[in-house]
């Protein structure tokens, strides 16, 4: 166990850019026989990453957990509910680092989708795939000002990076929650 960090620090990591949403959408339809509507949602949510899209397809319940956590965080942030923030941090703090990073990626993608929805007046958002989750995209899009977008993206991107740096997930999540409260 003492040698593993040394080995990892000597490894070279190559970031491979995602294929792109349209290519992943076509691949899901052709190779996995996924319905076009589902393929479109999955390609958007995976940001063009076929592995993540396939993971979401095969593990819908994992995606539902992220959607519920996102909705909860937005409600807590808007209400400036510190008690709720504490409970949310405790719940998400028990997740693994990889799952927490995926949550931050998921959240930034959702904010982007909602911004597109706001600018176009319609469109698909991940919550369309989960009718059992109570989230009013139209109502939230009215609260979301375009000036908030860089701040939201910064919170989610920095959270993902901080988790990758092995910072304490509870501290990162609490910081993200406080910063989101400041945005509203």
Question: For each predicted feature, which ranges?
Answer:
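Charged, glycine-rich active-site and insertion segments that engage polyanionic ligands
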Residues: 2-106, 117-184
């Amino acid at each position: 166990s003492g040698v593993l960090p040394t080995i990892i620090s000597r490894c070279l990591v190559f970031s491979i850019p995602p294929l792109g949403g349209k290519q992943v959408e076509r691949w899901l339809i052709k190779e996995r026989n996924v319905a076009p509507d589902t393929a479109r949602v999955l390609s958007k949510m995976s940001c063009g990453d076929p592995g993540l899209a396939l993971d979401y397809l095969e593990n819908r319940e994992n995606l539902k957990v992220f959607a519920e956590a996102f909705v909860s965080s937005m409600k807590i942030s808007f209400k400036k509910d510190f008690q709720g923030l504490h409970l949310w941090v405790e719940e998400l703090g028990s997740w693994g680092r990889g799952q927490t990073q995926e949550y931050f990626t998921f959240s930034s993608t959702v904010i982007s989708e909602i911004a597109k929805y706001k600018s176009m007046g319609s469109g698909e958002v991940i919550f369309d795939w989960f009718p059992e989750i109570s989230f009013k995209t139209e109502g939230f899009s009215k609260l979301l000002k375009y000036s908030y977008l860089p701040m939201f993206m910064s919170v989610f991107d920095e959270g993902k990076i901080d988790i990758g740096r092995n910072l304490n997930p509870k501290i990162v999540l609490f910081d993200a929650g406080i910063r989101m409260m400041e945005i509203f």
